[in-house]
Amino acid sequence: MPERNPVAPPALPWLAIAGPTASGKTGAALAIARHWRQRGGPPVEIISVDSALVYRGMDIGTAKPSAAERAEVPHHLIDLIEPTAAYSAAEFAADAARLIGEIHGRGALPLLVGGTMLYFKVWLDGIDPLPTADAGVRAQIDQRARELGWPALHAELARVDPITAARLAPADAQRIQRALEVWQISGQPLSSLHTGRSASSAWAHSGLMLSLEPTSRAWLHQRIGERFEAMLAAGLIDEVEHLRARGDLHPDLPSMRCVGYRQTWEMLDGLWPSAELLERCSAATRQLAKRQLTWLRGMPRRQVLACDEPGLVERVLSRADAWQADAR
């Protein structure tokens, strides 16, 4: 069965806050909800656009909104699945489309918040139909990767799908796994299924995306370091130890490849000393932020707000108020 390619005409209004890790998205979103509530405006419900927040039991390392924040403002697409499972961009797009309709049906406004840019892209631009993920096939691929290593599977992919293999690093486990899975299920290379002719989503022109982007890379890097210091103080290592103790997780799962969890797992495996954990997590997050900003630059409809300049919340509220007035 192909993955869902949701198109929802007529598309309803939506507001989104995107940006790299540590840019202040959560604070800005909560500020909008509180601002409109104080002014007698429409209630807000937040739709998480974050591939790490879907996992249960992964709270500290994902900077999951607190129980108090989630009680104050309804949040969706958080704690959806166990960390043994997977959640695709196509599933997100379908769930977001459904939730936007339900939120409008309750007389509220949907606010999409997050930094998983692939989710935004698939939801806004559509996606080619692809085979649904198969847990059995993935387990077989993971087992072979443990025996042979991902570079060997990358070489195998190069034989059956050289176009996809050429754009993937030999250690890009998640994407190599998906490409081999598609090949095994369909008998067709993933590159032949990415036609670029998928129908554009009806959502693309019905809302406003505010993108919080720094003018100073050093500012963002400092925020990232401070964020991980706080996570370590809050018990990130204990959280990963608890996940390891379950006995049903391994480091090749998408959940355990999340930034922070992967590095902590490797440290607990003795691959390098605990004194290096903060810098390794911070470095991986800096690379993630760089990729997020690259994705954002390819989204011409976004409105950029400098997140490292004074008055960010006020500027966000001004743009949100103007959008809300036009969306009535």
Swiss-Prot record:
Pfam families, per the entry: IPPT
Keyword entries, A-Z: ATP-binding, Magnesium, Nucleotide-binding, Transferase, tRNA processing
Source organism phylogeny: Bacteria, Pseudomonadati, Pseudomonadota, Betaproteobacteria, Burkholderiales
Region annotated Interaction with substrate tRNA, chain positions: 50-53, 174-178, 257-262
Feature type site, description Interaction with substrate tRNA: 116, 138
Gene symbol of the encoding locus: miaA
Presence of the UniProt keyword Zinc-finger in the record: no
EC top class, as a word: transferase
Organism, scientific name: Leptothrix cholodnii (strain ATCC 51168 / LMG 8142 / SP-6) (Leptothrix discophora (strain SP-6))
HAMAP family named among the record's database cross-references: IPP_trans (MF_00185)
Needed cofactors: Mg(2+)
Subunit structure: Monomer.
Function summary: Catalyzes the transfer of a dimethylallyl group onto the adenine at position 37 in tRNAs that read codons beginning with uridine, leading to the formation of N6-(dimethylallyl)adenosine (i(6)A).
GO BP term, pick one: tRNA modification
EC number(s) reported in the record: 2.5.1.75
Chain sites annotated for binding ATP: 19-26
UniProt keyword Transcription regulation present: no
SUPFAM superfamilies membership: P-loop containing nucleoside triphosphate hydrolases
Gene Ontology terms for molecular function: ATP binding; tRNA dimethylallyltransferase activity
InterPro entries, sorted: Dimethylallyltransferase (IPR039657), IPT (IPR018022), P-loop_NTPase (IPR027417)
UniProt protein name: tRNA dimethylallyltransferase
